[in-house]
Amino acid sequence: MESADILPGSRGTVDRRCEGSEEKITPPRPVEDFNPQLFPNEVYLNFTSMHGIQPVVARIRELSRKTVSAAMVPPLEWFERLPRLETPLDIEPLHLPFSVYLISGNAGSGKSTCIQTLNETMDCVITGATRVAAQNVYTKLSSAFATRHINTIFQEFGFRGNHVQAQLGKYQYSCSSSPPPIEELQKRDIVYYWEVLVDITRRLFESTASRGEFENIRALERLLGRAPGSLTRLAFCTNGSLPAFTRTNIVIIDEAGLLGRHLLTVVVYCWWMLNAAYKSPQYAEGKVPVIVCVGSPTQTDSLESRFEHKNLKCHVRSSENVLTHIITNRTIREYVSLSTNWAIFINNKRCQEYEFGELMKVLEYGLPITEEHMRLVDTFVVPEAYINNPANLPGWTRLYSSHKEVSAYMAKLHAHLKVSGERQFVVFTLPAYTFVKTAAFDEYKKITQQPSLSLDKWLAANASRVSNYSQSRDQDAGKTQCEYYSEHGVVVARTDVTYVLNSQVSVTTRMRKFVFGFSGTFETFDAVLKDDAFIKTQGETSVEYAYRFLSTLLFSGMINFYNFLKRPGLDEGRVREAYRRMAALTAKLIPGASVLESACDNPSGAPLNFRGLTDPPGFTGGTTNDWDDDNDVVFAALNEGAIDMLYCNYEFVRPETTQEVYSQFLMLKTMFVGRYSIFMDLFGGDFESSPFDTFVDNISYKGCEIFVGSMRGGVSSIALQTDSYTLMGYTSAPVYPFVEELARRKLHEGIAELFGAMNMPRMVLRDQHGFMSVLNVNLSEFVESVDDVELDMATAVDYGLSSRLAMTIARSQGLSLDKVAICFPRNNLRINSVYVAMSRTVSSRFLRMNLNPLRERHERDTVISEHILAALRDRDVQIVY
């Protein structure tokens, strides 16, 4: 990539210094003036990585310019014919051109950083294979610049909720030759994924919505006499609902190793179909989609599930993932010229210990395991009973191979906390509900020919399918109790779920939250104000709401400075000085508070005449009926400096204009920073570590329940699966944005009425910055697909929380964990699962496991490892250290 891509102004600098230039050149600063400590280490790390990433960016950009002739462009008519076919086996094979660039590497090697660079240097659609992967990428991108939310690849190509239960592989197509040509492989994948693809295709072409946005832009160009394509970008400014695939031909998929091999063709198919249907400029130019697959083929498995209705069993099997398919399939490998379109990232930057990093490379690339490696892993082994005892390793994350083991540990942990007398970690239970429609259930029994099927049995078999996340099986849940409401046509199944107060949790899906306060220390709140992190993360819809909210917290929280001065043991002289300085600061920022400053300078120490504050000018006497004697005694008894005149002289209103909103925030922020500086000067570290709590209204606690006077003044936001939260309790306080959101959902009439009457509590969480929020309930609808019939069966309502105290190894993929204790199974031990589990830790000092997997009998995928080792020796493959 040219230097101008990284340093846009460099070329202009060279021009100004060329021979004959009249411009005076400022001499550079002497070398001795340069201080390398002025820059953080991250700056140097980014520059050392740039050399390796530049060729990756340049090659992907080169692939994105590739075009095919008009004869090679898939015609729109071919896509329109597909829904009319009786069977997908009748599909006429057609070559759908595409390019692939593969980015692989071991855990923590910088693959996500490469995605960040691609996002900043070119127009591309960034996606994740799963919701967790998508949100991990979003977290990475938003840490540097404001970015739109990242969708999964399924959301981008048109996958919908009713496709979850689709029966994949219902039709099978066998290629007629070996090795098969690319169009034969593509037909095989389309036939395999037919139930989903035909529904997406039919839905697109049967839609009455206009798809002439690009035609309108081209007509406008002709009308204005502009060059073709000069106004194309306006289409995305005026039509926000345009598919992202019509904007660019570069599609990036993070954690692509979790996808089955057929998804490569599915993405290519949908890209061509959407661009053909919308007649996009890149379709007219014959541009070819570039699928950038990011991940590790040795870390992950692609899993497919199939539910057998007759026996009520869910069968899960592993299938060839898309990365392995690209690397090992001869036809695909040669078609995409893999050697010149592959970058391998090496070195684990998550855990930077040399010996441990070498061990990770051995597991990643299938290198020979030596006795030295085994002895290193021996140092991490402790008895399994030690890991499974909740009294040991408090605060560590347990990793298990199955949901059943996670649930068993959570039940053991809760039982331990109930008898331990622990005050910080208190156990409490809340109900979760599943609403089953009786008419749909009766129809299901009829279609599946199971007239005697009981609802209890069906619920037990479908517990993991009814909810919208697999971690629901990790919970410590009680026995399900069913209640029939005949008038509503609904059966309500209630299950009590146990939670731990003050434990670390994460949300299980992207959920709505309502931020209403802050709970932390003076130091952490000061850091939030200086960093503007809240504005960047919470002000996604309108920054004014975020500033209004912070102004509310600042105004409510100022009293904390005065509360600190009432602590016993403080030096009285410094306390008086703090009162005096705060009074002067308040008088400076709020002119009406100047009376306080003069009172604080009164050497006599006489009480301030509060009655005089309300007397008109020139008033010398009169009746005292305007003042209640009790109030007079209260005010007169206070030392004149102990009253925060901010609350006496400043009327807190909610401004409307942007200028007024920011002016109010700036004044209150200046006052907070000024007071913070005064207290740091007088009290130092004792002050900055003191608690600072502020909310939009008064709150109180009763056990694990939190009572809030009003939520007015809070701000609505989004909770992501990648965020870490502390569970602070629950509340039944009404949150009107949640009520409005529920009203907009098209729920079954009986379910909506029953759920509305339950007044289901909502969880209160504190994020890593200290902000307190109410989390909306997690409501998911379950649609069953049986023999081409879709049945709207049930609606599940729970709290959408997953504990970070224990999880499955598969769930931990992509996470960085501080302290990890792993329980590996003694049978069916796979090295790729071992690698995923061990590579989660940021330091091997905080890693424990129940056995040494290298000394146990295990399975190892040597085929893919051999291909990766061959690639490392291939000079055409880009290696990034």
Curated annotation (Swiss-Prot):
ATP binds at G105, N106, A107, G108, S109, G110, K111, S112. It is an enzyme of class 3 (hydrolase). GO terms for cellular component: host cell nucleus. It is found in: Host nucleus. Keywords: ATP-binding, DNA replication, Helicase, Host nucleus, Hydrolase, Nucleotide-binding. Pfam families: Herpes_Helicase. GO terms for biological process: DNA replication. Residues 1-32 are annotated as: Disordered. InterPro entries: DNA_helicase_dom, HSV_HELI, P-loop_NTPase. SUPFAM superfamilies: P-loop containing nucleoside triphosphate hydrolases. Residues 13-32 have a biased composition (Basic and acidic residues). Its EC number is 3.6.4.-. One of its GO terms (molecular function) is hydrolase activity. The keyword ATP-binding applies. The keyword Lyase does not apply. Belongs to the herpesviridae helicase family. Associates with the primase and the primase-associated factor to form the helicase-primase complex. Component of the helicase/primase complex. Unwinds the DNA at the replication forks and generates single-stranded DNA for both leading and lagging strand synthesis. The primase synthesizes short RNA primers on the lagging strand that the polymerase elongates using dNTPs. Possesses helicase-like motifs and therefore may act as the helicase subunit of the complex. This is DNA replication helicase. It comes from Equine herpesvirus 1 (strain V592) (EHV-1).
